[in-house]
A protein has these predicted regions:
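Conserved catalytic alpha/beta cores of large enzymes that bind or transform nucleotide phosphates
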Residues: 180-261
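N-terminal beta-alpha lobe that positions the nucleotide/phosphoryl donor
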Residues: 1-157, 164-166, 234-242, 255, ...
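Short acidic-glycine loop/turn motifs at beta-strand connectors
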Residues: 119, 172-175, 200-204, 220-223, ...
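Conserved metal-phosphate-binding beta-hairpin within the catalytic cores
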Residues: 256-282
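Acidic, glycine-rich flexible loop/linker segments
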Residues: 188, 280-285, 311-332, 337-420
Length: 420
């Protein structure tokens, strides 16, 4: 079969990530050229791996052993040849599961994205990685959805990679916020840096909050690396105001075309603005508060970006790596430099999340909004200024973390309740 170019497919074959982009590309929006590996290809390869009573893990392992067949490999080569620049053009390969980027859930980081893929062999491997991520630990641990499992699956979206000078996200709706970083957007989504942010209104920019970025993600050959941000860029915003307003206007057109508020991932290179992802907003952004932050009688009050609304109180639990996840107890306030998809299973357990870096599109922010817990991100030196075990109040509307009660000496230095 010929793999359909982006814009030709039906929604049932596309999955949640690719479907809105196909709609936008057909309508003339600046969506990078690409193609999809439709759901039917996933199902065709899966059919040879199924066996009576086989578990998801067993099916996954059989799929890996089988690999992409000769027919799919040939189709991938033909589809790459049809792209601008031909088969050696660097592309982004993204999962497009039927269960992600819906109005109910974004599925942040649940499945694979591989950037800088070049050539048919690397493409076949990347498609397999996306397919295998259908059995990610988070999904296998989740309860099955009655009546839907057989209809679900994994398509794959392939697009020409934009070697971005700047990238970010725009949230449309009643509150419009644009966030941007230098380089590829991977550093923003991964929460590795704190982006510049612009609050927008009908008359233009209402407020600009400078970010904190000491590294950027760039493509080097077929790899995406994080490199130190050049000194000349460290005091320079990723975007000028004219470009901010251009992206805002584009976002309003997308919102009107798709029929509702979206969060819109975009990238800018020498050719202009490119739309990389458009998904329905799964939760309302907290409104910025102009109220004073006196902590309601509390002691130390730290300030950051309110990324998920609500208020919660609990003991501070500091985690410095994913290897420490087992230390978390229900009701803890998670404190980390940043989080990534491997941390996702913690979020239903914790009362709130606080990070030193990140923005509205970072993993911690998206998952916190979906789970419904407060999140305050980009809190400078939070891991040094908050004691392990101290009782704190996290206010996701105000963007504050207030110490209510310092750590009890009985808990010992560096220990919180439940550390044993």
């Amino acid at each position: 079969m010929r793999l359909p170019m982006l814009g030709e497919e039906t929604r049932a074959e596309l999955g949640g990530k690719a479907a809105p982009l196909a709609v936008l590309r057909r309508a003339g929006f600046p969506v990078p050229a690409g193609f999809s590996v439709p759901l039917s290809e996933f199902e065709r390869h899966l059919a040879a791996c199924r066996a009576p009573c086989a578990s998801g893990t067993e099916i996954r392992d059989r799929l890996v052993a089988q690999g992409a067949d000769a027919t799919l490999r040939a189709d991938l080569a033909d589809a790459l040849d049809a792209l601008p620049g031909g088969r050696d053009t660097p592309v982004a390969v993204r999962s497009s599961a039927t269960t992600e980027d819906s109005p109910e859930t974004a599925g942040a980081g649940l499945h694979e994205t591989i950037l800088g893929v070049r050539g048919p062999d690397a493409m076949a491997e990347a498609v397999m990685r996306c397919w295998v991520s259908w059995w990610s630990p988070r999904r296998l641990d989740a309860p099955p959805r009655t009546g839907e499992e057989d209809a679900d699956g994994m398509a794959v979206l392939v697009q020409v990679l934009v070697d971005a000078d700047a990238a970010g996200v725009l949230f449309t709706g009643e509150r419009r916020v644009l966030e941007a970083v230098h380089g590829l957007g991977e550093s923003l989504v991964g929460g590795a840096v704190t982006p510049d942010a612009w609050e927008l209104e009908d008359t233009g920019v209402r407020d600009h909050r400078p970010g904190s970025q000491d590294l950027r993600a760039v493509r080097r050959g077929d790899r995406v690396l994080r490199e130190p941000l050049p000194a000349a860029l460290r005091d320079r915003a990723p975007l000028g105001e004219d470009r901010v307003l251009e992206i805002d206007a584009l976002g309003r057109r997308v919102e009107e075309h798709l029929g509702g508020p979206v969060d819109l991932e975009w990238a800018v290179d020498a050719a202009g603005v490119h739309l990389l992802q458009a998904r329905p907003l799964t939760a309302v952004l907290p409104e910025p508060s102009d109220e004073g932050s006196d902590g309601d009688g509390a002691g130390t009050v730290l300030h950051g970006v309110g990324a998920s609304g609500g208020t919660a109180t609990g003991p501070v639990r500091v985690l410095r790596s994913v290897a420490e996840l087992s230390r978390v107890r229900p009701g803890d306030v998670l404190l980390a430099r940043g989080t990534d998809p491997a941390w996702t299973p913690l979020f239903p357990l914790i009362a709130a999340v606080v990070t030193e870096t990140g923005g509205m599109l970072s993993h911690a922010a998206i998952v916190a909004r979906e789970v419904g817990i407060p999140a305050v991100l980009a809190v400078p030196e939070a891991m040094e200024r908050l004691e392990v075990g101290a009782e704190v109040r996290v206010d996701g509307e105000r963007g504050t973390v207030a110490v209510i009660e310092p750590r009890s000496p009985a808990r010992g230095p560096g220990r919180a309740p439940g550390d044993g």
